């Protein structure tokens, strides 16, 4: 009985230990199963069975490691998880290439590292293809063991402490880090197409495309521009020929199918537009000098003007009278005291020529002489029927007919024509006014001016009696007179009030005495 009790107690202790350890395993199992489920989607059946063994060993090793080792190991497992979940089936096939690079690097390591690397490859899923036959046999035994017992058994517990030595744990971590960092550098240098550097790939591709696009354009410009600018001669003559430009055009046509010019053709560029016809070879310096002499040997301008003066004198005389066959559009008249000179109304001329008012006509054509009329002259025009009676007392200006003819030419004529060149020559010669001999009369009488913008030389007779503008003294005198008037009015009012009062007081006194 005692032996049975001892065996029961021993079995109970074992069950407690197993239950305690199973609890530990159960606590760790969810992480183990979750990781296996994530990786099972992309791995084959062989890899599915090998993964739990690696994770079980890591869980047992983590129990004996310090807190730092506990924090470092999950980083290694997280990297494997991220890589397994993000890679497609095609990437799964390419992974052995990555491990081949790591195997090449492992040859340069020490013998100790070489002996320890297979252990790491036994636990990893990606390096199982490169193991020896002995490792393959162990993996098959582990597969069978896992198929029979999916849950971890006591064998895993016994294997765990053997692999938990510090020397065996720290060194693989260093090799794992070197394997993670160095292949990335080699992948960038060899393939230039890693998933980690997508931005650099795009930048390189854009840079390559830009260089490919820019180079042909640069070559086309250099090929096409050189013949155009270099072959244009400095001196125009026998050396010039269109062959230099035709060669460049033909070069563009031949290369047009392969290369594209930015302007599509050289005809649109500036050099092609600068083409000039070749100079005739027959011409020489002597012939050119002879032509220049013929051009310069022309009758002088003075001779032409004299001829034109004769021609103009046949059309109009100094008083403004036209020859036979010519007629003014405006009415002309003569005034007493002004001789035989013909005059026109400024308002009528401005209306016929299209000006808004006579003021604008005189302002735009300062060569015209504006003559101001007197009251007697206005009365004469009213009697002749040239002016309405209501304009008799208004200011009016008249213009000599010859000046209107010289200023406007055929525009002021109703009949007859005249050569415009001769008309311009007369103006350039500064022919004297048509009525110079009567000009002193206008100055003395009315103070006529050549234009409205010029000041009056003398005051007209109408303006002699006009009052002068107000000044400061005049304003003071007006103010003093107003104050004197107001004081005088107030005095008269006060006298009237006093007279009323005295009158009423006298009436009251009389009435009282009577009563």
Swiss-Prot record:
Its main location: nucleus. Residues 1-226 are annotated as: Disordered. GO terms for cellular component: chromatin; nucleus; SWI/SNF complex. Keywords: Activator, Chromatin regulator, Nucleus, Transcription, Transcription regulation. Belongs to the RSC7/SWP82 family. SWP82 subfamily. Component of the SWI/SNF global transcription activator complex composed of at least arp9, arp42, snf5, snf22, snf30, snf59, sol1, ssr1, ssr2, ssr3, ssr4 and tfg3. This is SWI/SNF global transcription activator complex subunit snf59.
């Amino acid at each position: 009985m005692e032996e049975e009790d001892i065996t029961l107690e021993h079995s109970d202790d074992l069950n407690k230990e197993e239950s305690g350890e199973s609890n530990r395993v159960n606590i760790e199992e969810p992480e183990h199963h979750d990781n296996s489920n994530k990786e099972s989607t992309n791995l084959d059946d062989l890899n599915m069975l090998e993964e739990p063994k690696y994770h079980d060993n890591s869980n047992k090793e983590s129990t004996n490691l310090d807190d730092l080792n506990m924090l470092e190991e999950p980083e290694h497992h997280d990297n494997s998880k991220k890589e397994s979940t993000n890679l497609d089936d095609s990437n799964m096939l390419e992974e052995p290439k990555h491990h081949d690079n790591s195997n090449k690097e492992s040859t340069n390591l020490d013998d100790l590292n070489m002996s320890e690397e297979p252990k790491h490859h036994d636990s990893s899923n990606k390096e199982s293809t490169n193991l020896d036959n002995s490792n393959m046999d162990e993996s098959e035994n582990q597969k069978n063991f896992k198929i029979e017992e999916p849950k971890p058994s006591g064998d895993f517990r016994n294997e765990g402490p053997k692999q938990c030595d510090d020397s065996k744990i720290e060194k693989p971590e260093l090799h794992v880090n070197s394997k993670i960092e160095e292949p990335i550098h080699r992948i960038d240098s060899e393939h230039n197409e890693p998933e980690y550097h997508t931005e650099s790939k795009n930048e390189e591709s854009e840079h390559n495309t830009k260089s490919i696009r820019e180079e042909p354009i640069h070559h086309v410009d250099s090929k096409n521009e050189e013949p155009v600018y270099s072959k244009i001669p400095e001196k125009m003559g026998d050396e010039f020929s269109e062959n230099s430009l035709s060669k460049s055009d033909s070069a563009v046509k031949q290369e047009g199918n392969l290369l594209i010019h930015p302007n599509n053709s050289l005809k649109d560029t500036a050099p092609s537009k600068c083409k000039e016809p070749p100079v005739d070879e027959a011409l020489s310096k002597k012939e050119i000098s002879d032509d220049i002499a013929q051009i310069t040997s022309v009758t002088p301008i003075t001779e032409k003007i004299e001829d034109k003066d004769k021609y103009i004198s046949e059309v109009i005389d100094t008083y403004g009278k036209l020859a036979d066959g010519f007629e003014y559009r405006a009415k002309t008249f003569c005034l007493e005291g002004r001789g035989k000179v013909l005059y026109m109304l400024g308002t009528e001329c401005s209306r016929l020529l299209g000006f808004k008012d006579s003021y604008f006509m005189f302002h735009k054509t300062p060569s015209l002489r504006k003559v101001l009329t007197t009251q007697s002259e206005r009365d004469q025009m009213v009697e002749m029927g040239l002016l309405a009676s209501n304009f008799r007392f208004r200011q009016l200006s008249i213009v000599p007919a010859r000046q209107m003819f010289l200023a406007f030419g055929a525009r002021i004529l109703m009949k007859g024509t005249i050569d415009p060149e001769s008309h311009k020559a007369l103006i350039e010669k500064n022919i004297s006014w048509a009525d110079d001999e009567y000009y002193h009369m206008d100055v003395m009488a009315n103070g006529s001016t050549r234009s409205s913008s010029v000041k009056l030389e003398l005051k007209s007779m109408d303006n002699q009696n006009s009052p002068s503008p107000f000044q400061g003294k005049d304003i003071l005198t007006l103010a003093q007179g107003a104050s004197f008037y107001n004081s005088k009015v107030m005095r008269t009012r006060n006298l009237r009030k006093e007279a009323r009062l005295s009158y009423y007081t006298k009436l009251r006194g009389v009435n009282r005495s009577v009563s």
